[in-house]
Amino acid sequence: MKTTVEKLSPTRVKLAISATPEDLKPHIDHAYGHIAEQVAIPGFRKGKVPPPIIDQRVGREAVLEHAVNDGMDGFYQAAVKETDIRPLGRPEADVKEWPGKDLTGDLLLEIEVDVRPEFDLPAYEGLELTVDSVEVTDDEVATELDSLRSRFGTLITVDRPAKTGDFVQIDLTATIAGNAVDTASGISYELGSGDLIDGIDEALESLTAGESTTFESKLLGGDNEGETAEIAVTVQSVKERELPEADDDFAQIASEFDTIDELRADLKVQVGKSKVFGQVTQARDQIVDKLLEGVEIPVPEKLVEDEVQRHLENENRLEDDVHRAEVKESSEKAFRQQLLLDVIAEKEELKVSQDELTQYLIQGAQQYNMEPNEFVQVLQQNNQIPAMVGEVARNKALAVVLDKAKVVDADGKVVDVTEFTQPVVRDADAPVEEPADADAEAVVADAPAEEAVAEEAPAEKPKKKAPAKKKAAEKAADSE
């Protein structure tokens, strides 16, 4: 097999592949075997039909097309490996020349595919990043202390109208067209939390125990989900939360500290860390924008257009040209950002350990309120585990750049970001490998090791353009 590469653009190439009859022979044999299993010919058992009879009854053209379809992906994968291109997206294949009916002559394929563009990585050591200045106020510390006190508060029944922050015990009845469709009794609800149906807070405000009222709202579940119903609510009791005194006794009960002053000091530190994390997030957002300003990264138009089309189809907004332009701009920036971080990860020789991938997957599962193994199974079914490895690697690349940057606030004060950038593992003890038959528990818990840097799109199977001939063979070719 011979392969040549023609560069069509910085992001697209054409592979010209010439496969000899010897290259195609294993696929010819497979085609005869497969067709023999599919056809029913009197006098022959399935799977036992000899090639000459298949040529006579089905046609040599059907065998050839079946063989080409069977071998095309292998030829493409070999060409990718031979030429060292880095494919992005789905390739498109065209059969330029078919072997003769006597199986002589080469098979000539032309395959176009988007590829990762080459670009000069901008310098990222010593980037200067300016973030907002922050300070911790006494009011913020007091708010944190009150939040902690509320965890140790007690509920006291009160004889007065309910107000925001009170806990009420209520009974609910939903009615549609005069028919009760749902009821609930003895529900404990914190007024103002917004955890129940719309309108409940306004309805309960100023009601006392034993009083009732009605209001309209859309139902959030059940057989009548989404329908508007009349909601009757009765207050059974009103309770307020009584907070413990903020003194040394409370500090000893609620924390590791002996005095309330020590507890307040620790809360101030925690609030400060939270604000520094906000500064770090701000710095991370600046990093990519600053780096992208210093480099021109070509974007594969077809890859982006396909992504835009999928996005608009999912939103059912194909005719919205303004939104299309917005999505295209966002997709192009996301591609450049991803590629930039991929190259940094490769330059820094970053690898993703199994523990790092596991933690990332667990966080993703929590975000979607799923069990980790269930979350991983969904990712595996959609072949998304490699993408997750890539995301972890990009996060590590960001951390490396941030670690090398100089971050100051608006007042010129240096911001210490080391807590959020160290350690960055380069030579991971157990780099990730995603075996083809790995189960969910293996991915979450204990996968084998392999180098894993930033995600690279796998060399997908070529999407073959309709051939100019061989139409009579389509049924046999599609029966695989």
From Swiss-Prot:
Q: Could you name the domain of life of the organism this protein comes from?
A: Bacteria
> Example GO biological process term?
chaperone-mediated protein folding
Q: Which InterPro entries match?
A: PPIase_dom_sf (IPR046357), PPIase_FKBP_dom (IPR001179), Trig_fac (IPR005215), Trigger_fac_C (IPR008880), Trigger_fac_C_sf (IPR037041), Trigger_fac_ribosome-bd_bac (IPR008881), Trigger_fac_ribosome-bd_sf (IPR036611), Trigger_fact/SurA_dom_sf (IPR027304)
The UniProt catalytic activity note for this protein reads: [protein]-peptidylproline (omega=180) = [protein]-peptidylproline (omega=0)
Instruction: Spell out the residue ranges making up region: Disordered.
Output: 447-480
Specify residue ranges for compositional bias: Basic and acidic residues: 471-480
The record's SUPFAM superfamilies line, in alphabetical order, gives: FKBP-like, Triger factor/SurA peptide-binding domain-like, Trigger factor ribosome-binding domain
Task: List the Gene Ontology MF annotations in alphabetical order.
Answer: peptidyl-prolyl cis-trans isomerase activity; protein folding chaperone; ribosome binding
Q: Where is the PPIase FKBP-type domain?
A: 165-244
Pfam families linked to this entry:
FKBP_C, Trigger_C, Trigger_N
* Function text: Involved in protein export. Acts as a chaperone by maintaining the newly synthesized protein in an open conformation. Functions as a peptidyl-prolyl cis-trans isomerase.
Record's protein name? Trigger factor
Lineage here is:
Bacteria, Bacillati, Actinomycetota, Actinomycetes, Micrococcales
